Curated annotation (Swiss-Prot):
HAMAP family: Cytc_PetJ
Major place of residence: other
InterPro entries tied to this protein: Cyt_c-like_dom, Cyt_c-like_dom_sf, Cyt_C6, Cyt_C_IC
Assembly and oligomerization: Monomer.
Signal peptide positions on this chain: none
Modification(s) after translation: Binds 1 heme c group covalently per subunit.
Role: Functions as an electron carrier between membrane-bound cytochrome b6-f and photosystem I in oxygenic photosynthesis.
Subcellular location: Cellular thylakoid lumen
Annotated heme c binding sites: C14, C17, H18, M58
Keywords for the protein's UniProt record, in alphabetical order: Electron transport, Heme, Iron, Metal-binding, Photosynthesis, Thylakoid, Transport
Species this protein is from: Leptolyngbya boryana (Plectonema boryanum)
Name of the featured protein: Cytochrome c6
Amino acid sequence: ADAAAGGKVFNANCAACHASGGGQINGAKTLKKNALTANGKDTVEAIVAQVTNGKGAMPAFKGRLSDDQIQSVALYVLDKAEKGW
């Protein structure tokens, strides 16, 4: 798993709702560092769980993405959040 591969997965599967780390469906649920921290989603494990199982308006990606792809996208999201998107 690596962030570069995660970027490709993100662009293909996540960017429609989370372009540039935003939250197009729920503006309070962005992928910005402060929002990840406030929502307890600021670890690889927490993001992996969210992507795998979904929650609210976000669909589950279990079965659509491999475990390695989900791990990679989590690394990508954290890397981009640290850099301010």
